[in-house]
Amino acid sequence: STLNRRSLGIGYIGLAHYLAKNGAKYDSQKAHDLVHKLTERFQFALLTASNRMAMEKGPCGYFGKTKYADGILPIDTYKKEVDELVEPQYKYDWDSLRDDIKQYGLRHSTLSAQMPSESSSVVSNATNGIEPPRGYLSIKKSKKGPLKQIVPGYQHLKNNYTLLWDMQSNKGYINVVAVMQKFFDQAISGNWSYNPEHYPDNEVPVSVMAQDFLTTYKYGWKTSYYQNTYDIKTDEIEEPPTPSTDLGELVSCILTEEEDCESCKI
C-alpha cells in the first residue's frame, strides 16, 4: 500500500516570519492575499513535480483511485465561501496541469499536509509551522536542557509579528488556514487560542467558541487540534535573567551564543 500510494505530506514552517517580513498581520487582507499566492504556487509546484516524475517513472499504483485521476484538483472542491476572503484569481495554468495529470498521472497519491513542525523549526530557527509565536522569546526543552529561541529577525521585525496571545480573536488565523486548505490535498488541523484577558471577568464566552467552530466549518476546515488558553504563565528556565535584563539584552546574548550552537552548524 505504501509503494502503491507513495503518499507525501509537505507543508510550511515559518509562516509567521514570512508574514512579518511582508508587514502583514494574520487578520489583515494583505495576509490572506499573500497566503493565497504562496499556497497556489506551493501546490502547483508539488503537483508539477509529481507529474513530471510520473512521466519519467510512471504514476503510483493507486493513482486511479484518486480524484486526481478524474482531473479533479483541490481548487475544484474547496468551500466556495473562501472566495469571501480572497478573490479566486490564479497566476498559474491549472487547466494545462490538469490535462497533464489526466494523461500521465502523479507519482504520489497525496502531496500536501500541514504538520506542527516543532522540532524542525528549532533546527531551522523558524517559527512553528503556520502558528503565530506565543512570544518573541520561547524556551523549549531539549536533551541538553532548556533551549532559548527568539523569533527570526527580532531586531527589525518585532513590531510586524502577530503574537498569539495578543490576538483579539481567532478570525485572522481561521481565515489564513481556510485559504491554505483551498489548495492542500490533505486536511489541515488548525488550532483555536483564547486569552481570557480579552473578555469580561477573564472568562471566554461559550458563544465565542461556538462561533469559531461554525466559522471554521463555513470556510472548509476539516479538523481542529488544540484549544489553547492563556494561563498567564511564561516559559520557565532554570536560571532566569535578572529583573534588570530586558529582552533586547537577552536577544543580544542569545545571538552571541548561536555562534557555538550545534543546531546552527547543521
Regions found by a protein language model. Name each.
Residues 1-266:
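Long, C-terminal-biased catalytic regions of enzyme "large/alpha" subunits
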